[in-house]
Regions:
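A short Gly-Trp-Pro
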Residues: 1-113
Length: 113
């Protein structure tokens, strides 16, 4: 019996728990690494000249859409965007994109990984 118990403990110790991706401002859970899509990382410059290092996720349940969608100055051809904000503190985290499908482009410096 002792041997079986030992094996059970060894099995449990091998289980890796996935870390959540958090809002850097309030630590609200935004998404998880398993929702990352490829290509995952991009650097873009907006028309005002600001650069953003963006991480793409198929979903970000902790981020809400804010504002009207527009395809103006979209970084992804065929996609319209709206702002993505933290559901808890309303901090701007990036953008939601809608086109053939929907995904979130989140600003790396506004996340805690």
């Amino acid at each position: 019996m002792s041997k079986g118990f030992s094996l059970e403990l060894e099995d449990k110790s091998e289980v890796q728990t996935e870390k959540s991706i958090l809002c850097k401002s309030c630590e609200h859970v935004i998404t998880s690494p398993s929702l990352a899509i490829e290509p995952h990382e991009h650097t873009f410059r907006n028309p005002a000249g600001f650069s953003f290092h963006v991480l793409c996720y198929s979903d970000a349940p902790g981020a809400s859409e804010m504002g009207q969608s527009t395809s103006e100055a979209s970084w992804f051809a065929g996609y319209a965007w709206t702002f993505a904000v933290c559901q808890q503190c309303q901090n701007h985290l990036g953008w939601w994109y809608r086109g053939q499908d929907r995904f979130a482009g989140l600003i790396a410096t506004r996340l805690k990984r």
